[in-house]
Amino acid sequence: MRARLAVSTAGIQVELREILLRDKPDAFLHASPKGTVPVVELADGTVLEESRDVMQWALSQNDPDGWLDVQHQDPDHTAAFLDALDGPFKTHLDRYKYASRFDPDTALEHRAAGAAMLAEFETRLAARPSLSGEKNGLLDFAALPFV
């Protein structure tokens, strides 16, 4: 979702293909043996396999709404936020949301840990209009599918 948002905002034309993850097409697996979505195959053969990378690529081409402003202003904070979102937060979210695939006995612990991270988001939002600062940007749209 966040990769598509960035590609759309950047105004980049791409061919979207819906992938049924239980029946992955050979061409998809050839481009990305990892077999996860999203995948963007660039004209030069470069393959982007992470939504965060797709967002960065698209917005580096065209950033009409200034989503990357926060990254230009504070690259260390931006990287740390995205690392926490894509790492610990996503881990806690998955282990709570899909507890039956993991350890159901720890689901509530993961919910509490994820809630603590959301409380940090709330603290930031109490001080300014968006996670990215004065206007919605990269951090807000990167977090959107998870909250």
Question: Where are each of the predicted segments found?
Answer:
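GST superfamily/GST-like fold recognition
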Residues: 134-147
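GST-like domain detector, emphasizing the conserved glutathione-binding G-site
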Residues: 1-115, 122, 126-129
